[in-house]
């Protein structure tokens, strides 16, 4: 359990050499797991980048991973928060990072979460971005599990995948989610993947690049505007209030006897 109202900090420091201020250090990587409670109470937990006297050389945000007593190792909350520092440095998911499957993600306060080339992040719950997200070549974001998830904010993904029939994925209104290389959204017969707006009746925006490989099958989509990109070609899919979506049935095999 955590008690009190203090602050746990893993903030980066500002470097000084020979009286001159160096760029701020990156925030640390912290994790807190509760074994007897489901609330972190009033305790603040930070991993901000170090500050620099000038406007552009603050350090990158670190990360904080929070788990309550009932959450498994990959069910916690990943927070990437830079405390309003300058947004010029990235918090990288690189090949050196372990534990890239999480429950939910929050990116905020001038943080910039970057998934490096050929790296991946798997998220079972919500993805909330009010700061910045960078996807390098061939990086992958996967939405896992069957519980309802929401994607808040605008993003440009390299590869974006959800293959969980029965799952509902909601998207925020007024934000665009772009996909550059792979868009894979699939449910299964009798158990479609549901794509919805966070605000029913209001459009969420999808932008598929012309070079993106699309696999969209057994989906139920509502309130989606794909006109920012190329048309979405979907098999075995139903939809309402959609724009730039093309619905088709799977091919039928004729047997001659």
Which sequence ranges carry the predicted segments?
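Sequence/structural signature of small/polar-enriched beta-strand/turn repeats
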Residues: 1-166, 172-257
């Amino acid at each position: 359990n955590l008690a009190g109202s203090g602050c746990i900090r893993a903030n980066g420091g500002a470097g000084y050499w020979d009286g001159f201020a160096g760029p701020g250090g990156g925030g640390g990587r912290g994790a807190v797991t509760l074994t007897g409670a489901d609330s972190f109470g009033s305790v603040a937990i930070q991993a901000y980048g170090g500050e620099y006297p000038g406007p552009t050389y603050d350090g990158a945000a670190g990360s904080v991973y929070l788990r309550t007593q009932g959450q498994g190792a990959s069910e916690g909350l990943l927070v990437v928060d830079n405390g309003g520092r300058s947004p010029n440095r990235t918090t990288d998911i690189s090949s050196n990072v372990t534990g890239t499957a999480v429950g939910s993600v929050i990116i905020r306060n001038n943080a910039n979460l970057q998934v490096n080339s050929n790296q991946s992040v798997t998220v079972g719950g919500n993805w909330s971005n009010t700061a910045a997200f960078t996807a390098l070549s061939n990086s992958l974001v996967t939405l896992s599990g069957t519980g309802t998830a929401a994607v808040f904010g605008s993003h440009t993904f390299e590869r974006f995948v959800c293959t969980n029939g029965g799952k509902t994925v909601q998207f925020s209104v007024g934000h665009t989610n772009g996909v550059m290389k792979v868009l894979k959204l699939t449910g299964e017969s009798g158990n479609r993947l549901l794509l919805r707006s966070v605000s029913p009746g209001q459009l969420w925006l999808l932008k598929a690049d012309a070079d993106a490989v699309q696999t969209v099958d057994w989906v139920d989509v509502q309130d989606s505007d794909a006109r920012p990109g190329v048309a979405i070609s979907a098999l075995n899919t139903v939809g309402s209030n959609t724009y730039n979506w093309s619905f088709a049935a799977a091919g039928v095999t004729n047997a001659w006897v």
